[in-house]
Regions:
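Conserved, mostly hydrophobic/aromatic
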Residues: 20, 50, 79, 120, ...
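Core AdoMet radical
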Residues: 86-106, 110-202, 208-215, 237-242
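Short, catalytically relevant binding-site loops at active-site mouths
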Residues: 215-219, 245-248
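Structural motif corresponding to alpha-helix initiation and N-cap regions
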Residues: 40, 157-158, 221
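Zinc-dependent deaminase catalytic domain
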Residues: 39-45, 226-238
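Flexible, acidic/Gly-rich N-terminal and inter-domain linker regions that tether
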Residues: 1-77, 81
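Short, well-ordered secondary-structure micro-motifs
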Residues: 131, 162, 185, 221-223, ...
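Radical SAM enzyme [4Fe-4S]-AdoMet core and its adjacent flexible, acidic
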Residues: 232-239, 243-269
Length: 269
């Protein structure tokens, strides 16, 4: 297939997406056959199609979010990419949970700079009850500012999510990271299903979910497509697209950095 023919195919098959429909399975497969090798004119066609879909669905507006590392390091999980894992020797900062006033002060500083969403992020699989209460107090303070109060605190129960929602939580962040099939290559201390259940629990609790993945860990294009479809089925409202920055001391320290074109292909997907 010539680049011109491929670009024409992309424009043709992407039209249903612009109008709000979903692609038929066969059309999706045809695009996924072309995307991994797309360059030049073909990749530009994919990018233009992605922009058209975005404009049709959510327009051109952008929001600015920021986070605070409220608790850092000493994590018991063994995620192969993470400098905060206690399983690996890295130079990641380590500190216990910040007190609520410091978290709120960090949020206020960001609000003055035009940030409209602020996330409280903590290392570890889940927070103990007393720390959860501290975060709830901080979220209440953040919610009083002209910004949305978000959090990323690991695997939480519906009761814990309800407590945070009552305190002012606007949305919850919990990445799936990769496909179900590739996940055991990246993490064995937590099941993929546990992560998926967090997304379900948020939906049952009426909490919008922000969930995406990390790319460049050695996953295949089939893994990337599977993750995208899983996130679609989970009904997430925002999908963070992260690219691996290999960190010395972690199992993925020697992974090559993704090329610019490969990063563009992933964003298009």
């Amino acid at each position: 297939m010539t680049p011109t023919h491929a670009a024409s195919l992309v424009r043709e098959l992407s039209q249903p997406l612009v109008s709000g429909a979903f692609l038929a399975a066969r059309d999706r497969e045809r695009l996924l056959e072309v995307l991994p090798r797309a360059t030049g004119e073909t990749l530009d066609a994919f990018a233009a199609a992605a922009v058209a879909v975005r404009r049709a669905r959510i327009g051109d507006a952008a929001s600015l979010c920021a986070i605070v590392s409220a608790k850092s390091g000493r994590c018991g999980e063994n995620c192969a990419f993470c400098a905060q894992s206690g399983h690996y020797a890295t130079n990641a900062p380590q500190h216990p949970l910040l007190p609520p006033p410091r978290i709120v002060a960090a949020a206020a500083a960001m609000a003055r700079r035009g940030v409209t969403r602020f996330g409280v992020v903590a290392s570890g699989k889940a927070l103990p009850d007393e720390e959860l209460e501290s975060v709830a107090t901080a979220l209440t303070g953040i919610a009083r500012l002209p910004m949305a109060a978000d959090a990323s605190l690991g695997v939480l129960s519906e009761d814990a999510l309800a407590r945070l929602k009552a305190a002012g939580l606007a949305a919850y962040h919990h990445n799936l990271e990769t496909s179900r099939a590739f996940y055991p290559s990246i993490c064995t201390s937590r099941a993929f299903e546990d992560n998926l259940e967090v997304l379900r629990a948020c939906r049952r609790s009426g909490i919008p979910v922000c969930s995406g993945g990390l790319f460049g860990m050695g996953e295949s294009w089939a893994d990337r497509a599977d993750l995208a479809l899983t996130l679609l089925e989970a009904g997430v409202f925002s999908v963070p697209v992260n690219f691996l920055s290999p960190i010395a001391g972690t199992p993925l320290a020697d992974r090559p950095v993704l090329s610019r074109d490969e990063a563009r292909r992933i964003v298009v997907l």
